[in-house]
Amino acid sequence: MLKNEHIDCGKEFDWGLASADYAKYRDIYPNEFYNKIVDLGYCKGGQRVLDLATGTGVLPRNMYKYGAEWIGTDISENQIKFARELSRGLDINYIISSAENLDFPENNFDVITACQCFMYFNQSVLFPKAYKWLKPNGHFLIMFMAWLPFESELAMESEKLVLKYNPSWSGRGMTRYEVTAPEMSKSLFDVANTVSFDIDLPFTRETWHGRIKACRGIGASNLNTEEILNWEKEHKKLLSLYPEHFTIPHYVTILDLKCRSNG
């Protein structure tokens, strides 16, 4: 179980509880997202990449074709179990560990990635370690993708239903924001690039239901089995009011931090 006073009012959560749904329904990043990363010059052939809080290995698996050497890490044993199963036939090394407890040699990676997870880290511990692990002029990519509930009736109604069962869930109400460097990074890293864009992602009733169930407010929460089943019944009833196929607007951001030279 994880716990952070700034997330969900300090309630415990565990992504390992949601791993099966996470593996099935959260591999939804569009090709445009991966292409943006490659266009910036990262996660390509000849590079060593460390993916922090890799979950079920979504980023390494989808970017493996670009030729980089990947290591994926996650604190959840169950997440890593699914990552390994989904990565069969791919030469990706997975490690069970929190980001803060990892230990690698200096100058070991060209790129470090953190996708949809940066808010969970202890930044005062992680940034000095990341700086040490990266090669000179190495890059730390912090990425995020969120649905926009104020621009989608269905997304808003889904959020309301999550909050009905888990009022402490703080992952709601996302809006566009300016991409800026975290304060803790500024002594070690400079901003090399910022990227942000909107995209409409396609869903069916089933895949949107699965995506919401796999969020921190339901599948990874401490709700009991009966509560989750009741939520599922209500959410499926809500979805029956909408077409079988639809799109949900999302906002994507990439923050590219470059190691500051000591020279």
Spans of features found by a protein language model:
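Conserved class I S-adenosyl-L-methionine
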Residues: 1-53
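Class I SAM-dependent methyltransferase SAM/SAH-binding core
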Residues: 56-101
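A short acidic, Gly/Pro-enriched loop at the edge of an enzyme's catalytic core
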Residues: 100-111
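A short beta-strand submotif of the Rossmann-like class I SAM-dependent methyltransferase core
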Residues: 111-115, 123
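A short, conserved alpha-helix within the catalytic core of class I
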Residues: 121-130
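Conserved Class I S-adenosyl-L-methionine
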Residues: 124, 179-263
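Conserved catalytic/acceptor-binding region of the Class I
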Residues: 131, 135-201
